[in-house]
A protein has these predicted regions:
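Interfacial "coupling" helices/loops that link adjacent transmembrane helices in transporter permeases
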Residues: 12, 325-367, 433-449, 836-878
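Selective transmembrane-helix segments that form parts of the transport pathway or gating/packing helices
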Residues: 334, 356-376, 412-416, 452-453, ...
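C-terminal transmembrane helical bundles of large multi-pass transporters
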Residues: 771, 796-889, 893-898, 908-912, ...
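Short cytosolic juxtamembrane segments of multi-pass membrane proteins
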Residues: 397-398, 431-448, 907, 943-958
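Juxtamembrane segments of multi-pass membrane proteins
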Residues: 476, 480-487, 491, 496-675, ...
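Membrane transport/envelope proteins' first extracytoplasmic loop
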Residues: 2-323, 333, 387-395, 405-408, ...
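Alpha-helical transmembrane segments, especially those used as permease/efflux helices
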Residues: 14-32, 36, 269-284, 303-320, ...
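Short helix-loop junctions at transmembrane helix boundaries
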Residues: 375-409, 465-486, 816-822, 883-951
């Protein structure tokens, strides 16, 4: 049986090779989902964990278990209970986590103890208490160095306990090196009267400092080294706590796991084990505490991973649909080619199962090849996705940490299931037909299924209804996650219009044919006559090309629009290349002035002076220009006697320098920003106000606004009166809306009235205010170079933002890379299968029309005229399909991309949505199409030249 199957596949090897390619692509695409999501998710996770270290200074892989032994009510020796819990639970927890332990720190503190100085100071009546506890850390000696004195001994000497202090603790505690103090049971003595005779001598023998302050060991810091009195861990556990067991207060296990080794599939296990340890310790002592620096990050990661996988499935769905159609087409061609054989077997008594077995073996062989090659191709696909920075744009980015895992097998099997169903459907349809029925059906002309069922009209009606409802609810969907139906409906819309065009296209050809019936040349006549009787194969290839072009254009426009809007929103939100937020400290003065009603009012005139010296930045060679920008939230805005109760933001700028530094897109302002700045220069009290203000008050240019301010302590700052000189909708770093949720389930996004005025006028009205410093870098200077210079000059700042760095971070985000990569990949795969389908069509077309060519040659047509006829056919089929694909792609982009952007954008974004279409993207698409058309034409010419013309002509004459 296997020999027969292989021989059968060899006899029709071209179609089977095409089918194998389809199966491999399906497997590779589906396998790329878990491969990419695992690599991208792991990358996101590691970056987020590193951010913890940068933002907080904490070690990202730390788990802290706090065991308050003194609060435990059960009987037994406290230290024994601790050792038992550590042996049974802590060690098992480390193993179950599945990560290398690179840091391990165990700390113990005492309670019920007091440390007193042995001598009284002259000014004191009582003995001074220094501390109420001792600390010990296992292997602490390996991470410190003694700067004065010596290290404590690992055993008590002469009945005294040796301790050490950090340099900071030594400067704070009133004790000298070599001095002895008394350690007593709490409650036995309170420092009054004579010192008890029975006490433990504690001697300070050394001062220490960190051996390597940059060591992650010091990030696992639970105790305050500036106060802690450190004793030998061995002495405390083996001597002191055995003699005084109730002195044991708390034990801290601080475990530093190698967070760089965390893989995506370990996240659920890690969180489960962490929660299990928390429960185990809670069951012992309710006041226990188990925390992890990565807990919140891992929780958010699971959400991000689900969103990433979901997004990739959404983006890949149009490609999968095209692949399914492609496999259906090829498998149908194979079955049609075998139809005479199937009918013969059926007529000779073969059962449906006998016929199915042949094709099942074929499916098994093809699936085996796909399983072997598909996952490897999936790896290559993931590499391509990871290096994508836009539509058909790639950069030399560091490869994602992608590994083949067990999950891939399940996805690969799903792919084979899809392939099996797709291929078996045509077999089931044709296996029911006998030889007599086959001959009868061959003579009948019957409309295709989708034409009989009017699927094109049904699909368009569904898409129209969905689009209408979705567009009506754009306010509700803004900022929500991607809707899978959005991509599906866009693809269905393309299919619907494509099918509708294919339905009416033959009628258009007939109309053209009738108009010039007596004028057409023989080649044109033969072409139009053939196309007016267009069959399923021509319709299928036209639909393929229409979908390929339309989806390519939609993908290109979508990627270009999303990427450009995202980048420009970062620029607009930041306002400039670099924004520095200085460190401020205010010294307040109070003055008495008259308020709006003429009453004497005490107002606060703040004078912020510490930090914010822009001259420090002006002196840097790496900075070309700087400007100061002030933003304040006013208490109220008055128009005559009417108060506008809407959130608002006042921005004070220096017009001349602002124009040199600020990033402004001319597309979002009705006139050049210089027009606005010139007015501010000419008129000190001029202001530009959001056009939104017209919805709350009847104001026009020339009207005045009175704006009052209060600080965070609700103290009155002052009043400013400005004249409206124009209205704006967008301004650098200011948003039209702000997020202000309430308890009444109202819309949390409120209008924000933007007011832009002169910084000098604002400070004259309110006093010296805090400001941010906006910088424009000198040509060729990178963000890191500027930051290094600021650090080198020791210029203090509270926060610094780089627009370019934010853009790079956004582009390397796993979700954005996935979107760009899948859009690019989708187009490449569609173009590839369209090329294969196109080649198959022309190969079968030439092979099946040998008789027609013979008749035409016998009638006197030259070979050149036959080639021209086929060229016209290609133009009328492929050329028109390309044109219609471009039109449909443009229409779909205009309709669906704004809706898509609504779902991924934020209501409070500064930059307005704009559609961006690049000619370069279209040129790339056209280049691929030209390759397809030239391939088809070369096959036509090659096929005709290979024909045995003498036999063809003789056949035509007969």
């Amino acid at each position: 049986m296997l020999h027969i199957i292989i021989k059968k596949m060899q006899s029709n090897k071209t179609l089977f090779i095409c089918l194998i390619i389809g199966a491999i692509l399906v497997t590779a695409l589906i396998c790329s989902i878990p491969l990419y999501s695992s690599g991208a998710s792991t990358n996101i996770l590691k970056r987020d964990l590193e951010q913890i270290k940068i933002n907080t200074g904490a070690f990202p892989g730390e788990v802290l278990a706090e065991y308050p032994v003194s609060f435990e009510k059960s009987g037994g020796i406290p230290l024994d209970k601790v050792n038992s819990f550590e042996e049974k639970e802590i060690k098992a927890f480390k193993q179950r986590m599945g990560l290398p332990v690179i840091l391990d720190k165990k700390s113990i503190s005492t309670c019920n103890t007091d440390l007193y100085k042995l001598t009284k100071l002259d000014s004191q009546k009582n003995y001074m208490r220094l501390a109420d506890k001792l600390w010990a850390i296992k292997d602490f000696e390996k991470h410190i160095k003694i700067v004065e004195g010596r290290m404590y001994r690992e055993e008590s000497a002469d009945g005294s306990l040796e301790v050490i202090l950090s340099k900071r603790a030594y400067s704070k505690l009133d004790v000298t090196l070599g001095e002895e103090v008394a350690l007593l049971q709490h409650g036995e003595w309170y420092g009054k009267g004579e010192l008890p005779k029975k006490y433990i001598k504690v001697k300070l023998v050394g001062i220490y400092e960190m051996d390597n302050p940059a060591d992650d060991y010091w990030r696992l810091s639970q105790l305050d080294y500036g106060k802690a009195i450190m004793v030998s861990y061995k002495v405390l556990t083996e001597e002191i706590l055995k003699q005084y067991p109730n002195w044991l207060d708390k034990v801290y296990w601080q475990i530093g796991f190698d967070y760089k080794q965390i893989e995506f599939f370990q996240v659920k296990t890690i969180r489960a084990e962490f929660n299990k340890l928390r429960g185990q310790l809670f069951n012992r002592v309710t006041s226990s505490k188990v925390s992890a620096t990565f807990d919140k990050t891992l929780k958010n990661y699971e959400i991000k991973e689900a969103q990433l996988v979901f997004t990739i499935w959404i983006l890949i769905s149009p490609v999968m649909l095209m692949l399914i159609l492609y496999i259906c087409m090829v498998s149908q061609l194979i079955v049609i080619d075998d139809q005479n054989e199937i009918s013969g077997l059926k007529s000779r008594g073969a059962s449906k199962w006998d016929i199915l077995k042949i094709y099942l073996w074929e499916i098994v062989i093809i699936s085996g090849i796909a399983l072997a090659i598909g996952p490897l191709l999936g790896l290559l696909i993931c590499t391509m996705i990871g290096s994508s920075s836009g539509f058909l744009e790639f950069v030399g980015r560091k490869a994602l940490p992608i590994k083949i895992n067990s999950q891939i097998l399940s996805y690969a099997l799903v792919a084979q299931g899809i392939f099996f169903v797709t291929m078996i459907i045509p077999v089931l349809i044709y296996s029911r037909v006998g030889i007599v029925e086959h001959k009868q059906k061959a003579k009948k002309k019957k409309k295709i299924f989708w034409q009989r069922m009017w699927l094109d009209v049904v699909i368009l009606l569904i898409c129209t209804y969905w689009y209408y409802n979705y567009a009506r609810n754009t306010q509700l969907i803004q900022g929500q996650s991607m809707d899978p139906l959005l991509y599906l409906v866009a693809t269905l819309f393309i299919i619907g219009i494509g099918l509708l065009f294919i339905r009416i296209y033959p009628w258009c050809i007939k109309l053209v044919y009738i108009i010039g019936k007596n004028k057409w040349s023989p080649t044109a006549y033969a072409t139009l006559n053939h196309l007016s009787r267009m069959k399923g194969s021509e319709q299928f290839i036209m639909l393929f090309m229409i979908m390929a072009i339309a989806i390519g254009i939609v993908n290109a426009n979508e990627a270009r629009t999303l990427n450009t809007n995202r980048d420009r929103n970062i620029w607009c939100n930041t306002g400039a290349e670099v924004v520095v937020r200085p460190i401020w400290k205010d010294f307040n003065a109070f003055f008495s002035v008259k308020d709006m009603k003429g009453n004497e009012t005490s107002i606060k005139r703040p004078d912020y002076w510490m930090g914010g010296n822009e001259y420090e930045y002006e002196q840097l060679e790496q900075v070309e220009s700087i400007t100061k920008v002030m933003t304040e939230k006013p208490e109220r805005i008055m128009v005559d006697e009417n108060m506008i109760e809407v959130p608002s933001t006042v921005m004070g700028i220096e017009p001349r320098s602002f124009g040199q530094v600020a990033w402004v897109d001319s597309k979002i302002l009705p006139v050049s920003i210089n027009e606005y700045l010139n007015i501010l220069i000419q008129k000190q009290n001029a202001a530009f106000v959001s056009s939104k203000i017209k919805e709350y008050s009847d104001v026009e240019v020339g009207d005045s606004l009175r704006i009052t301010f209060r600080d965070s302590k609700d103290e009155y700052l002052g009043e400013m009166k400005v004249v409206i000189c124009g209205f704006i909708d967008y301004w650098p770093s200011l948003a039209n809306k702000v997020y202000m949720p309430d308890n009444n389930n109202n819309d949390p996004y409120k209008d924000n009235i933007m007011i832009v005025c002169n910084a000098s006028y604002l400070t004259n009205s309110l006093g010296t205010l805090r400001y941010n410093i906006w910088l424009k870098k000198a040509p060729g200077i990178t963000d890191q170079e500027l930051l290094d210079t600021i650090e080198e000059k020791e210029i203090e700042y509270k926060n610094i933002s780089f627009a370019t760095s934010q853009m790079i971070e956004s582009r390397t985000d796993g979700l954005n890379m996935g979107v760009n990569g899948m859009l690019t990949l989708g187009f490449i795969v569609i173009i590839a299968i369209t090329l294969i389908g196109f080649i198959i069509y022309w190969m079968i077309s030439i092979k099946g029309r040998a008789l027609q060519f013979g008749i035409l040659r016998a009638m006197g047509l030259k070979q050149k005229q036959v080639i021209i006829m086929l060229g016209l056919e290609q133009l009328m089929i492929s050329g028109i399909a390309v044109l219609i694909g471009v039109i449909i792609g443009g229409i779909t982009s205009d309709l669906f991309i704004p809706l898509l952007y609504k779902t991924v954008s934020n209501v409070t974004e500064v930059y307005p949505f704009l559609r961006f279409y690049a000619r370069l993207d279209y040129y790339r698409i056209y280049a691929y199409i030209i390759i397809i058309l030239m391939s088809g034409l070369s096959i036509v010419i090659k096929g005709i030249r290979k024909m045995k013309l003498s036999q063809v002509i003789k056949l035509g004459e007969e």
